[in-house]
Amino acid sequence: MSLDTAEKQKLIETHQVHATDTGSVEVQVAMLSKRISKLSEHLQGNIHDFASRQGLLKMIGKRKRLLSYIKDKNVQKYQDLVKKIGIRG
């Protein structure tokens, strides 16, 4: 489940670090989180879509690694990002 251009642009604008930022870790995590939520909704109705389930697990792993990187570099940024995106309880 991909994101359309308008959704990507909105995510970039809300999570960018500076004016021309499109690929910072914060933006990547936000995009992955949105894709994960869309794919999770898809899998609720299509329980036998194993290829999509595999893709979902890969995306979750990538997001976990990116969040770990942010946490190692700056704990305050990590906490703000987790709160802003609404993940991890």
From Swiss-Prot:
List, alphabetically, the Gene3D superfamilies matched. 6.10.250.3130, S15/NS1, RNA-binding
Q: Does the keyword Ribonucleoprotein apply?
A: yes
Q: Which Pfam families match?
A: Ribosomal_S15
Superkingdom field: Bacteria
Q: Name one GO molecular function term.
A: structural constituent of ribosome
What are the alphabetically sorted keywords of the record?
Answer: Ribonucleoprotein, Ribosomal protein, RNA-binding, rRNA-binding
As for family, the record states:
Belongs to the universal ribosomal protein uS15 family.
Subunit details: Part of the 30S ribosomal subunit. Forms a bridge to the 50S subunit in the 70S ribosome, contacting the 23S rRNA.
Q: NCBIfam families given for it?
A: S15_bact (TIGR00952)
Q: Which HAMAP family match?
A: Ribosomal_uS15_B
The name of this protein is Small ribosomal subunit protein uS15
Gene transcribed to yield this protein: rpsO
